[in-house]
Amino acid sequence: MSDLFSFNKEKKNKLVDNNYSAKDIEVLEGLEPVRKRPGMYIGGTDSNAMHHLVSEVLDNAMDEAVAGFASIITIKMHQDHSITIFDNGRGIPIDNHPKFPDKSALEVILTTLHSGGKFSNNVYHTAGGLHGVGISVVNALSKHLEIKVYKQGKLYSQSYSKGEKLTDLICEEASKRLRGTSINFTPDPEIFSEKLHFNPKKIYELARSKAYLYRGVTIEWECEVEVPSDIPKKALINFPNGLKDYLSSKITLDNLIIPEIFSGNIESTPDEIKLEWAICWQNNDNSAFIQSYCNTVPTPQGGTHEQGLKSAILRGLKAYGEMIGNKKAANLTIEDILETASVVLSIFIAEPSFQGQTKEKLVSNGVSKPVENIIKDHFDHFLSSDKALATNLLEHVIAIAEFRISKKNEKNISRKNATQKLRLPGKLADCTRTTPGGTELFIVEGDSAGGSAKQARNRETQAVLPLWGKVLNVASSTLEKIVNNQAIQDLEIALACGSLKNYKEENLRYEKIIIMTDADVDGAHIASLLMTFFFLRMPKLVEEGHLYLAKPPLYRLTQSNKTYYAGDEEEKAKLTDKLSKASKAKIEVGRFKGLGEMMPAQLKETTMHPEKRSLLKVTLEDFQNVDKIVDDLMGKKPEKRFQFIYEQALVKMDKIINELDI
């Protein structure tokens, strides 16, 4: 106890000695905060964050279209990996700003956070861009940005780099028929990795999503870099029937429970809401998804508009069941109804409120009830217009509900009860915590790695499951093989959440599932087999964000009795160069043959300690096509695998050619 007080005293004295004065307060001006903390504005510095820059520029163009001022948007990906987005709208204002008389409005918008025309309803009734943050953030995080504005027979242009102005506003003569705004930019490799480039498929799908969200716009697509076989080099993208067209393109029509897509489109309401939706029910629950948008901005975390739709569908089916005397309908939940449903929802409202800068969840009050009333009214008409169709749908969702209810008694209410009921694998070193929150399961290969991991773990929160024998490739195996495989049996028993349609997140015994394999090629192969298992047998576990990859080191570098670790050859080279410049002392390099060769203390320090390790979260951008993607790469047909590798090689070769100094 005395040690505790002496420690606090020492700590207090250190704080007193450390003068905390005005000079310690940082004041970041202009776009400095964006470059210093990009994650606060775009959610990180990874590939998803970099593509968010494209979304911001495209959202601004879409705002012009939705407001009725633009009909064509052009997206062009260039050989140098820059991108140009043009809209034929009114063009950003170029006259001097009244608050900054020495600057054009264009320069103010590009260099000042929280500037723009979306703070009132005078310019845009509905808007999707980040209200004066989006384009200035793009400018701040771009190595180069050039903007062109066509207005009244003039072309106004200006160049920027990393948020700083390179040129004054230049005015030239141009055709009077041209109008609008063109923005070309290249993400800054100092912020994003030099290895990162725009993904043509991702941007093409983004363009498609914007086009179906607003029927009045045509998007011209052009890509100069190599594209996958399913992505065109050039295309005109337009969906005259909006969301219904889009949903039809995403599903297999002969796989529908009922042959009709329930869709609707309301242009305006007394609540000043524009609403569109499309819903269908399929035989395969792996095809289920919900995609929602507000003012063309994706809201992957849902929000009040989704709540309204869910309430409408649930109330509608329960009311129909009551009307025809089917008492089982009273037991329905929204999860039963949506288990095999594919849903697309779009809403346009004035002054939307989002959760966070990246706007992933709509939190606007006063949205849920109007959406519920509109969709409920249309759904009632949809069901009553075709009795056979409505009865088929009702019986389908009731069957799902009955299956859920039949399993209710088998559910493990707490993790403690689950542990008591399950005969856990003998090789599992379980953690002592009895609730899933904060717990982790490390999946390792063999006893050697398992032994080190068991000694390195935190026994309260970290469990270790060594897998014996060859990990099965479930993509090319029969159901009988999968069911009888010992490693898969052990894994499914340890997780306790079930698989495929029997998967239940509430039964999952751990918050994080971490695949921890050797840092070499063999380890990567085992990790790919395990990920294949999760993608095909437990895709919702991945979708819900429970699956991770550990990043153990491959090399150990020692200099002057100090130890450093590197994950791969490139990291080793950079670290060696850094250490050589800092000191002339000899650097000793050792290569780990595997996790089992590492001392428990090393494994804990580099790979397992939550505050010191680095984890990769496993995500999928296209859950609807996961079966096809995994089958192409991991399935029985080598020609599909060859095509996948060939397409990736083309992308890689394109990068290499563009980097050659010729």
From Swiss-Prot:
Gene Ontology cellular-component annotations: chromosome
Cited CDD domains: HATPase_GyrB-like, TopoII_Trans_DNA_gyrase
Keyword Isomerase among record annotations: yes
Any one GO BP annotation for this protein: DNA topological change
NCBIfam families the record matches: parE_Gneg
HAMAP family: ParE_type1 (MF_00938)
Subunit structure, interactors included: Heterotetramer composed of ParC and ParE.
Protein's recorded name: DNA topoisomerase 4 subunit B
Species the sequence originates in: Rickettsia felis (strain ATCC VR-1525 / URRWXCal2) (Rickettsia azadi)
